Amino acid sequence: MWDNIVLSGFADEIDPSLDEQIRVLKKLGMNHIEMRGVNGKGLVEYTLEEAKEIKKRLDAEGFALSSVGSPIGKIKITDDFEPHMELYKHTVDLAHLMEAKYIRMFSFFMPEGCEDYSPYKDEVMAR
C-alpha cells in the first residue's frame, strides 16, 4: 500500500541547516523534501550555481524534492507583476535543476476589504 506514496514535508521547520534536515528525515524514514528554506534562506534566493551544490548534497544522501516551496503568488493582485514573473522563471529553472515536478504557488492577495473576488478571477488565472 505504501509503495506508491511519497511522504514529504517542509524540512526547514525542523532546522535551517540542510545537514540537520537530512539527519532528522532519515531518522523518520523519509527521503523527500518539499524544499522551501535551506541553510537559512529560501531556495528561490539561491543562484542556479549555488543550487547545484544543494542538489549534489541531496543526491549523495539519496534525497529528492517532492516540490519547490515557492513564494510565487504571495503578492497583491494589484502589484506590478513583471518582477514577480522574473522570480517565477527563476523558480521554474530551479525546479528543473532540482528535478522537482511541482512548484507550490499561491493565488495572490486580494485588496483589503474586498468581499467579491470574482472581478479578479481572470487576472489570477492570467498570472
Model-derived segments and spans:
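A short, Lys/Arg-enriched amphipathic alpha-helix followed by its capping loop at the start of a domain
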Residues: 2-7, 24-30
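Active-site acidic/histidine proton-transfer and metal-coordination neighborhood
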Residues: 3, 17-23, 60, 77-127
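Short polar catalytic/cofactor-binding loops
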Residues: 11-16
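Conserved beta-strand positions in the central sheet of alpha/beta enzyme cores
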Residues: 34, 67-69, 104
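Glycine-rich, proline-tolerant flexible connector loops at the mouths of alpha/beta enzymes
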Residues: 34-59, 107-115
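Glycine-/proline-rich flexible loop or hinge segments
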Residues: 36-40, 69-77
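Alpha-helix-loop-beta-strand connector modules within alpha/beta enzyme cores
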Residues: 48-70, 124-127
